Regions:
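Hydrophobic anchor at the beta1->P-loop junction of P-loop NTPases
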Residues: 35
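Conserved substrate/cofactor phosphate-moiety recognition/catalytic segment
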Residues: 48-93
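Extreme N-terminal, non-catalytic leader segments
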Residues: 1-32
Length: 206
């Protein structure tokens, strides 16, 4: 007797409309722009600016924000290492579906562990654009938009990335954004750099 959940009894159902047809309809190529970096590095700011700039160009995108997905999809997960890994795995699987639908999926998460990000890259070998927000810890802590660094320094939050849990920077990211002469680029400038990459690689045409 078979049981539900037995992978030998689960089969992939093909769609009558394929990825190429969807991309042609949208006049763009589906991909995942994965924005990673410390809390306060500007990930969500870039994600919102990028999504808006794409919208003004008639391109369809969707943001998967690290905080937002914990309100629903990942509300059962905590912040232990294994939960963080599962958090990233789930977001990676959802992002893959968005890309297959022909959308430009913008994933904005700290995603501190290199192996977890690389696992997501492996899901999308031809459509994964890793954007590293390489901002100094001191700057992120100074911004502290959610007051989390202050809580972590006071010992009220354990396992906080950058304080008592490591952030592993990318080794092979497509785009690295950082300060220039001690000045942070504007959200529009950062979005423009990503859009230039997408244009050069052909993602903004079907």
């Amino acid at each position: 007797m078979s049981t539900m959940g037995n992978s030998t009894n689960i089969f992939w159902q093909e769609s009558p409309v394929g990825k190429l047809e969807r991309q042609k309809l949208l006049n763009q190529k589906g991909c995942v722009v994965w924005i990673t970096g410390l809390s306060g590095s500007g990930k969500s700011t870039l994600a919102c600016s990028l999504s808006w700039e794409l919208h003004t160009r008639g391109k369809l995108s969707y943001i998967l924000d690290g905080d937002n997905v914990r309100h629903g999809l990942n509300k059962d997960l905590g912040f232990k290492a294994e939960d963080r890994t599962e958090n990233i795995r789930r977001v990676g699987e959802v992002a893959k579906l968005f890309a297959d639908a022909g959308l430009i999926c913008i994933a904005s998460l700290i995603s501190p562990y290199r192996k977890d990000r690389d696992a997501c890259r492996a899901m999308l070998p031809d459509a994964f654009i890793e954007v590293f927000m390489n901002m100094p810890l001191a700057l992120c802590e100074e911004r502290d938009p959610k007051g989390l660094y202050k809580l972590a320094r006071a010992g009220k939050i354990k396992g906080f990335t950058g304080i008592d849990d490591p952030y592993e920077p990318p080794l092979n990211c497509e785009i690295e954004l950082n300060q220039k002469d001690g000045v942070c680029p504007t959200p529009s400038a950062m979005a423009g750099e990503v859009i230039t990459y997408l244009e050069d690689k052909g993602y903004l045409q079907g």
